[in-house]
Regions:
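A short, surface-exposed loop/turn module that caps and links secondary-structure elements
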Residues: 28-55
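Solvent-exposed, charged helical/coil patches
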Residues: 1-31
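Enriched for short, Lys/Arg-rich terminal
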Residues: 3-4, 12, 23, 38, ...
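Generic leucine side-chain signal with a strong bias for well-ordered alpha-helical environments
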Residues: 17, 33, 72-74
Length: 96
C-alpha cells in the first residue's frame, strides 16, 4: 500500500463537493492509487500528474510522487477549471 497525503487545498476541494456520488467515486479512485493502480493518469509537467475520473463534470486530481512510495494529492477540479488547476498544482508541488 502506498502512502497518500493530501494538501489542505485538496481537502477543502473534496469536502466542498456537493456531488456525493462523485465524491465517493473520487475516494474510491484514491484508494486504488494507494493500491498502486494509477489508472487514467498523465504528466502535466513539473513532476505533477493529472488523474482523470470519468464521471460527472470530468473530475481531475492533481498529484505528485515523492520517494516513489508516497503520493501527495495537491488539488482537485474538473474539466472547466483544468488550466487553472494545473498551474496551481505546479505551484504547490514546487513549494513543498
Amino acid at each position: 500500500m502506498h502512502e497518500i497525503r493530501k494538501t489542505e487545498e485538496f481537502k477543502v476541494w473534496l469536502d466542498s463537493l456537493k456531488d456525493l456520488i462523485g465524491r465517493a467515486k473520487i475516494q474510491a479512485r484514491i484508494k486504488r492509487l494507494a493500491e498502486g493502480n494509477q489508472g487514467n493518469t498523465k504528466s502535466v509537467g513539473s513532476k505533477v500528474f493529472e488523474m482523470k475520473i470519468d464521471f460527472g463534470p470530468g473530475y481531475r486530481i492533481y498529484y505528485t510522487k515523492h520517494e516513489s512510495v508516497m503520493y501527495l494529492l495537491l488539488i482537485g477540479g474538473d474539466k472547466s477549471t483544468q488550466n487553472k488547476d494545473i498551474q496551481q498544482a505546479k505551484h504547490l508541488a514546487k513549494n513543498i
